[in-house]
Amino acid sequence: MVAWYPVSTAANGPGFVPGSNCTPTGRFRVWKKIGRGARMGTIFRSREAVGHWRGETCEEDLILSRILWLDGLDAANGNTRERYIYIHGTNQEERIGHTASHGCVRMTNRDVIDLFRRLPEGAEVVIEATALGVILPPLML
């Protein structure tokens, strides 16, 4: 392991079923990177920049700063891309380290920008159910 980032994964725990709001585990590749050059705090909806979050408190689970859209490499997680499972920044950084998402992997905005910079499309990442973190293989950094 070369890098580890604290994250927030699904409040519903790990899983692979569409509509379950669970975070899939296993091996993935970064299928698509979205948000290159966007300001920290840029709000994305349907993978399009639609505004900027200014730090105000809100209950909505915003997708911020960068998106790394994942594609599953294992039989069990092969539907990940179609489930729109991302690694992304969040407006709820205080919940990092706790299960809180609707299936995506949330990171602090600084960390997701750093990860976005480090990983090319096609890079492999591992999500484990035993730790609230994302592991990156040595050759990708």
Regions found by a protein language model. Name each.
Residues 5-33, 38:
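Electropositive
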Residues 1-2:
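Local beta-strand/beta-hairpin segments that build beta-sheet-rich folds
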